[in-house]
Amino acid sequence: MSQKERPTFYRQEVNKTIWEVPVQYQNLSPVGSGAYGSVCSAFDAKTGFKVAVKKLSRPFQSIIHAKRTYRELRLLKHMRHENVIGLLDVFTPATSLKEFNDVYLVTHLMGADLNNIVKCQKLTDDHVQFLIYQILRGLKYIHSADIIHRDLKPSNLAVNEDCELKILDFGLARHTDDEMTGYVATRWYRAPEIMLNWMHYNVTVDIWSVGCIMAELLTGRTLFPGTDHINQLQQIMRLTGTPPSSLISRMPSHEARTYISSLPQMPKRNFADVFIGANPQAVDLLEKMLVLDTDKRITAAEALAHPYFAQYHDPDDEPEAEPFDQSFESRELDIEEWKRQTYEEMISFEPPVFDVDEMES
């Protein structure tokens, strides 16, 4: 929302809370809510398309909330890629910083997520190729900006009727230099180095998640449905084998080293015996993604060039992102200053320019 020409707002009650939005957003209808906000679908009368409007809940309630709000806005503003959710609009009914308390974010309305799709149908190998290719294409972009998503799972991957995919929910994403902050990812898709707090993790935590998702698309079953951290790790090691001593010795955590050294030795299984009937190229790619040693795990850019994606791979159409300045992560500011910086970011937002066919997808 730039302050050039402030739109007319109207008020509407949604699930016992008052929403105050520009008149261009009509037919507000609740579609979901979580800890950090609630979402309505709406008709954008300016463009004629359906959008998702998210009202952040108590965005400046505490320093943690205020910094999270700033982070989410900065991340969404930065993302301009077909396979990553981007910001169409951001607004507040407030007319000045003094009365600024509400933040609304507008993005594309995506119909289904990958969870719905897996439940409804067994996917063909060609479907799996196209879906995983798009996830990796989006990840190459995200990772090139030195951002780790850290919460990749089927419900964070939106898919439309044409099988076109966007990566959602950067609320938890952090800069690669950041250490673990506890609350990340649904455990089933979580890389073991995060789960066990091995600490030295990198962008390939997202590749582990893609491997788990790809295996699920191929088989129709969750790959590692662990009941808790220990059970999860046992399930992982039944497939990957126990880590070699060369990897254990590089773990900074004494507890992790001691615990893993105490486990009974398990050999790595032959993936072809686990994924019977799958395309051998798919199996080969899974073996390169589901590697315990993060230094040996394939990157998004490398995976895009894997023969499994031969019919989709185009090195000239797999863009990287502009560098993303995340020096703010180490800043300790008060609520009012985070709020002021969020307000500045909102005022300076320039909406993306879309072709009609892009909006229709």
Curated annotation (Swiss-Prot):
Top-level enzyme category: transferase
Residues at which ATP binds: V31, G32, S33, G34, A35, Y36, G37, S38, V39, K54
Posttranslational modification: Dually phosphorylated on Thr-181 and Tyr-183, which activates the enzyme.
Gene Ontology molecular functions: ATP binding; MAP kinase activity; protein serine kinase activity; protein serine/threonine kinase activity
PTM-bearing positions, type Phosphotyrosine: Y183
Key words, A-Z: ATP-binding, Cytoplasm, Developmental protein, Kinase, Nucleotide-binding, Nucleus, Phosphoprotein, Serine/threonine-protein kinase, Stress response, Transcription, Transcription regulation, Transferase
GO CC terms, sorted: cytoplasm; nucleus
Pfam families: Pkinase
Reaction catalysis annotation: L-seryl-[protein] + ATP = O-phospho-L-seryl-[protein] + ADP + H(+); L-threonyl-[protein] + ATP = O-phospho-L-threonyl-[protein] + ADP + H(+)
Motif TXY location, chain numbering: 181-183
Its job: Serine/threonine kinase which acts as an essential component of the MAP kinase signal transduction pathway. Mapk14a is one of the four p38 MAPKs which play an important role in the cascades of cellular responses evoked by extracellular stimuli such as pro-inflammatory cytokines or physical stress leading to direct activation of transcription factors. Accordingly, p38 MAPKs phosphorylate a broad range of proteins and it has been estimated that they may have approximately 200 to 300 substrates each.
Protein name: Mitogen-activated protein kinase 14A
